[in-house]
Amino acid sequence: MKTPLLLVLVMACGGGGPPPAKPEPVISAVPTTRVPVEDDESEEGVTIINARGHMDPKVVEAGMAPHTQALTECYTMNLKKRRWLGGHVVLHWDINKDGTVTAVRLAESDLGAWPIEKCLLEVARLAEFGPPINGDADFQIPLDFTAKGRLTSWDDDQATRAVGGQLVKLDACATKKVPAPSDVTVTLYVGPGGKAQSVGFAGKTVIDDAWADCAAKAALALRLPDPKGQIAKLAVKYRTE
């Protein structure tokens, strides 16, 4: 089977001491899409053929090149003193055969900072690409943001106990025009007194900005256990199918 390659943007915030040089994203030399294409190799007598198209890695890189600095600034300009903010983000594009981008979403994110994630989406929506090869395609680009501050991570059981049934408060953010997304990963940071410090979202479908704006306010008002002098990071699921 053919193995997909990835365009990787690595971003980090500077440490203490003298002002660090402004971080610059590093782009791999061989970016590609994460879309299956026709495969001539047989496995146990079966030939697998996928009718979807795929993106030329050079087309993806050319489309992203004008926006790498803006993606960096989404993180650095919104970080403030929250040096514990960091994580892995995967941006996902759906693109028509003529090169028109039809959807952009956060396929993955444990960054836990909706203002930064929203900024990344806004920049990603500005990117323009040449047409795919052999029809409609989709592709993903991972980004990594390195946290410098100290924090503790709560496991799934701890996270579930901490949040309990409070995520029902996010239901109020759904409207007739903006329905609630499904299978959403909610990442939270908890600080002194059990106060939520930051929250972010990712999902298998497009999460409307208006819903996420509302949900972020609701999530930041949740009552959570006190991590006692630490910043704790946790992730829970919302509306899983």
Feature map (PLM): residue ranges:
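Sec-dependent signal peptide recognition
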Residues: 1-8
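C-terminal motif of bacterial Sec signal peptides marking the signal peptidase cleavage site
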Residues: 10-12
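Charge-biased low-complexity segments
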Residues: 14-241
